[in-house]
């Protein structure tokens, strides 16, 4: 009986150690998931902000108003010239 008690004790210790390791791994995974969710929310907010900014910059009326405010006019052929790159 002494040998069987030793093996049972060893099995219980291995099982308990396994349970502790699994719980620790679960906690680590849960904190990593929580951190990833917070990062996802922050990235979604940044993306929404950039889309709003892109829509604002692409607004033709806003571009036209900014050009008029700065007294900018479309270029005419007399004001343009070609620059060629020589190798």
Swiss-Prot record:
Its family remark reads: Belongs to the FtsL family.
Q: Does the keyword RNA-binding apply?
A: no
**Coiled-coil positions:** 31-71
Task: Give the chief site where it resides.
Answer: membrane
Q: What is this protein called?
A: Cell division protein FtsL
Stored Pfam families: FtsL
Subcellular locations according to the entry: Cell inner membrane
Membrane-side (Periplasmic) residue stretches = 24-87
Which UniProt keywords are present, listed alphabetically?
Answer: Cell cycle, Cell division, Cell inner membrane, Cell membrane, Coiled coil, Membrane, Transmembrane, Transmembrane helix
Listed under subunit, the entry gives: Part of a complex composed of FtsB, FtsL and FtsQ.
Native organism is Neisseria gonorrhoeae (strain ATCC 700825 / FA 1090)
UniProt xrefs under InterPro entries: Cell_div_FtsL (IPR011922)
